C-alpha cells in the first residue's frame, strides 16, 4: 500500500450502474455490497457477474472496487460465506471490508489475493486496535465515525506507515458509538 498525499475519494454504489457512475465522476474507489454478507444486503446489490464487470470497468479507468463483507455471521452462515468468498476472489475486486475477526482469518485463507479493510463496524478508536488488525493482515482500518481529527493524528503516529486510515467525513451518526447501537 502506498502512502498517499491526497485523500482517496471513495463512493458507495448499490448496483453496477451506480459503480460505473461513481467511477465516471471521479471516484478513486467504489465500495459496494453483494447480494449476501454485507450489513446492507439487498436484492439490488451486485451479483458476482456484476462485480467482475464492475472491477474490469473500474480498473480500466484507474479506480478500485471494495466489497462490503462486514456482517457478524452466525454459525449457520460460516460455510456459505467461505463458499461465496471462494467465488468472489476471482472477480477482480480489490478488497474486502470486514468487521468480524473470524471472517478476517477466513478471508486470509480463502481469498489471500484480496486486501483486507477493517470496517467502521469494528469500532476502531485507538492505535492498539489498529495495530492488532494490522497484525491480522488488514491494510486499512476505517476508524469509528466519532473520532476527532486529533485522535486520528494520534493513531496515525503510532501505527505502521503501510496501514491506511480511512475516516468518514459525512453521513449518519449513531446516538451511541457506531456499530454499538
Residue ranges of model-derived segments:
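Non-catalytic helical/linker scaffolds that mediate oligomerization, partner binding
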Residues: 1-181
Amino acid at each position: 500500500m502506498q502512502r498517499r498525499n491526497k485523500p482517496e475519494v471513495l463512493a458507495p454504489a448499490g448496483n453496477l450502474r451506480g459503480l460505473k457512475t461513481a467511477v465516471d465522476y471521479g471516484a478513486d474507489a467504489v465500495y459496494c455490497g453483494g447480494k449476501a454478507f454485507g450489513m446492507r444486503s439487498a436484492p439490488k446489490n451486485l451479483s458476482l457477474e456484476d462485480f467482475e464487470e464492475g472491477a474490469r470497468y473500474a480498473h480500466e479507468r484507474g479506480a478500485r472496487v471494495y466489497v462490503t463483507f462486514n456482517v457478524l455471521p452466525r454459525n449457520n452462515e460460516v460455510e456459505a460465506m467461505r463458499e461465496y468468498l471462494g467465488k468472489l476472489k476471482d472477480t477482480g475486486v480489490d478488497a474486502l471490508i470486514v468487521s468480524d475477526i473470524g471472517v478476517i482469518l477466513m478471508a486470509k485463507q480463502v481469498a489471500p489475493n484480496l486486501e483486507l479493510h477493517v470496517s467502521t463496524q469494528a469500532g476502531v478508536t485507538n492505535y492498539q486496535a489498529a495495530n492488532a488488525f494490522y497484525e491480522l493482515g488488514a491494510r486499512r482500518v476505517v476508524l469509528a465515525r466519532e473520532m476527532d481529527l486529533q485522535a486520528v493524528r494520534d493513531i496515525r503516529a503510532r501505527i505502521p506507515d503501510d496501514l491506511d486510515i480511512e475516516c468518514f467525513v459525512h453521513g449518519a451518526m449513531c446516538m451511541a458509538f457506531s456499530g454499538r447501537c
